[in-house]
């Protein structure tokens, strides 16, 4: 299974639950940047299921005929993440344009970066990032390790890292909500089991795990 980095905690739990319902089945995940995973799929990597962090990335896979029709299964929004206690005294999105602040955002070619670009455009803010990361977990790590004063990451990532970061919402986030699609890949060597996993993700049990992690309805 190839899945967006922001799905790490939720899908790991779903994988364990799925395995318990299917004795003898082992689920192996490759979590990372949706864009990187899509490239791997397009190059023929042996993957059964792809869950992307936005429809545009999934479209690059379906456009080359590598996936069955996808189903949207959750949504996610950005939050401002700061180290515990907010030592940089970040108050809102405007601080991302303050060159005296250390800022991390996702690179523009990955879904969390594309969402960030929409947010900044809506807020009429030109960000001044100190680092552009290739996936949301790498961006979050900059906050967890106190390397930056703030970052834009998904709400679910703030929840997953609640022991090391604080997060807060901002109005423009809803204008850049990401919808996540999932699909069985046409080259799957385990198509039946792959479809069963997708069905489990879409089931009440799978959706309960995703809601607990902070994901919204698609």
Regions found by a protein language model. Give the residues of each.
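N-terminal glycine-rich flavin-associated loop
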Residues: 79
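Exported/periplasmic ABC-transporter solute-binding proteins
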Residues: 1-21, 26, 35, 39-42, ...
